[in-house]
Amino acid sequence: MSRTLKLAASAALLLVTGCRRTESESAAAPPASYYDNSGHSDAWTGGARKITISTPKGPHQLWIKRIGNNPKLKLLLLTGGPGLSHAYLEVMDSYLPGAGVEYYHYDQLETGESDRPNDPDLWTLPRYVDEVDQVRKAIGGDKSNFCLLGHSWGGLLAMEYALAHQDQMKCLVISNMMASIPAYNDYARKVLEPKMNQAVLKQILDIEKTGKTEQPAYMNLLMPNWYEQHILRRPAAQWPEPVLRAEENMNRKFYVTMQGPSEMGASGRLVNWDRFNDLKRITIPTLVISGKYDTMDPAYMAAMVEQLPRGELAATNGGHMDMYDDQPTYFGKLIAFLKKLN
């Protein structure tokens, strides 16, 4: 074949390949209506706005941010902690828009850009369930379109919400949260802690006994020996900026009151929470996301799926923040689940 023919053939091949790629990308891209901001009062603020909710102690304002337009599927993101802002879930922005998912970042009361009344009387599960319901109404969510994705504490809250209001839900995603705090604590004590350097573990437990968990020495021990192993599996110096921003802006008092001083088990108000036997009452489609190296027992998470009448399991090769550790699996499974419902 002459050099001219070879060039022509190559050009034709590139043209065909390019057309196929464009067609594929076009098929995968969200429709133009996804970017339609008609009728949205938040169009001038990039989707962000404040909404007012009622509480037993009076009205408060919450920060929410809408991304996309899809009246058939509205996904509300519930952050973990308790006490973390929406910042660490900004990773969703790299994946969900391409799938045409309308979703909402949301700072719970006492976190991020929302009001921080610093009132422990408001730190109860029933009140937070009511808060989520008020946010649902504010974004126009109902049984035809409303889905919750709760990560960690947000997963606990999402389970509680579904048990109270699944008649207003289309689907549920439980990300990295066991349905029992006692079982979560057992996994830490009986499985994860025995694998640690026992001298380091003793130092950590000794600090906890003294109550001096706010001292740098405590986190200096936890970070390489627990957080880098089970929370986000890379050196802390390489943690993504959104995660660091969420940590820096964390409501520590809220966190310690509800969870305890660290991620090495729970000792706060949530210590006796257990809903495993109630999972069978959640009849909407539910995706359970579990990380191999998480502080949440993968075998227990698989058992949760068996309890859920319409449960599905997404097992990742990551830790507690597997939306960073194993993005192909996390977002591949999440988007496939949501697309079936869209």
Where are these regions (language model features)?
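Alpha/beta-hydrolase
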Residues: K202-K280, I284
